[in-house]
Amino acid sequence: MSFSARACLRAVSLTVALALSACASAPVHYYTLVSPAAQPASAQPAAPFAIDVLPVGVPAELDQQAMVVRQGDSGVAVLDDERWVAPLGDQLRAALSTQLVRRLGTQDVAGLTRPVNQPVLGIRLQIRRLDAWPGHAVQLEADWSLGFAQDPNGVRLTCHTQLQQAAPGGYADLVRAQQLAIASLAGRITEDARGWAQSRQHGCTPQA
C-alpha cells in the first residue's frame, strides 16, 4: 500500500471515529406531557357521566415527536435531541384525558363500547398555539367544545382560553411548564363539564 493510500485510509478512519464520537456525545432525551399518576384525586363527588376525549387538533408544525421551540419573535427550532415519546397530538390527548379522569372521578371511554345506562360527554380540544420559549415561558391558546350525544339537536358548549406558565430552567422545566398549562386547562374544562351537566344554560367559566 502506497504512502498516499495509507494516509487517505487514516484520514477516513479519523473522520469516521470523529463522527461516531459526535453521535455518542449527543444522547436523545424523551419527555411526556402525562403528569405522574401519584397526584391526589379530586375531593368533589364523582361525575355522573363518562367522558369521550376525542383526538386533539394541533397545528401541523407542532404535531411531531421532535420538540419545537420559539426563538425570538419569528424564529423556531426543531430539537431532534429533545423529543416527545409520541407525536404531540397524542401526548396532549393522553395528558388531558388523565387530568379529566382524575378531576371528574370518571372514565374515558374513548375507543370502548359506550355504556348503556350512563351519559357520555364528548370533549373536543383544538390547540391554536403552544409556544415554548426555553428559559422563559410557555403560552397556550386553545378552543374546546363539549356536549352529550343524547342531547337533541347536538347542542354543545364552545369555549376559548389563553394560559401562560413560567419556564425559567432547561428543557425538563419547559416540559413541566407545559404539563402545568395542560392541568390548568383541564381544570377549566372540568368546571364547564360539571356545569353543563347540571344545566344547558351554563356558560364558559371566565378566565381568572
Which positions does each model-derived feature cover?
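Bacterial N-terminal signal peptides that target proteins for export
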Residues: 1-12
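C-terminal motif of bacterial Sec signal peptides marking the signal peptidase cleavage site
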Residues: 19-22
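Surface-exposed short loop/turn segments
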Residues: 24-41, 47, 103-152
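C-terminal/domain-edge helix-coil "capping" segments
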Residues: 24-30, 169-208
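N-terminal segment of the mature soluble domain
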Residues: 49-118
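Soluble periplasmic/extracytoplasmic beta-strand elements of cell-envelope proteins
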Residues: 50-55, 68-70, 122-126, 139-145, ...
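Short secondary-structure boundary motifs at beta->alpha junctions and helix caps
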Residues: 76-83, 151-191
